[in-house]
Amino acid sequence: MTLYNALERERKEQDKRNRDRELKNKFDELIKARQYMEMEINGLKFVLPKKASDIVNEGSALHHCVSTYVDRHASGTITIVFIRNASAPKKSLYTMEFCKKEIVQIRAKYNQNPPKEVWNAAEIWKKKVLTRGRKNA
């Protein structure tokens, strides 16, 4: 039984390493393809997550469920965008879900709605992304 447990544990660890490698490759591809989505507008910085743990950490910092979106972001079904204060780009402020050319939601800490100014900047971001996206397609 001990040998079986050791083999099973090793198999699970290998599966996790394979999944982590696959996620990293998907994130790397997304960053290259969607680099044009990163920009600064009205003192807010729109940033793409560079790896799966960025999304998990964002959910932890803001106490919301964005960590459940890792696979959808990695597959390209949706795009998760972090919205930061340009003067403090490392600090989590808002998280945006973008899908099918629309802003689905923007959430602040504890799932609160962001101020109107953030929505206004996000709408400007969307217009720029849709214009730039046509050029990059």
Feature names for model-found ranges:
Residues M1-A137:
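Catalytic-core elements of nucleic-acid end-processing and repair enzymes
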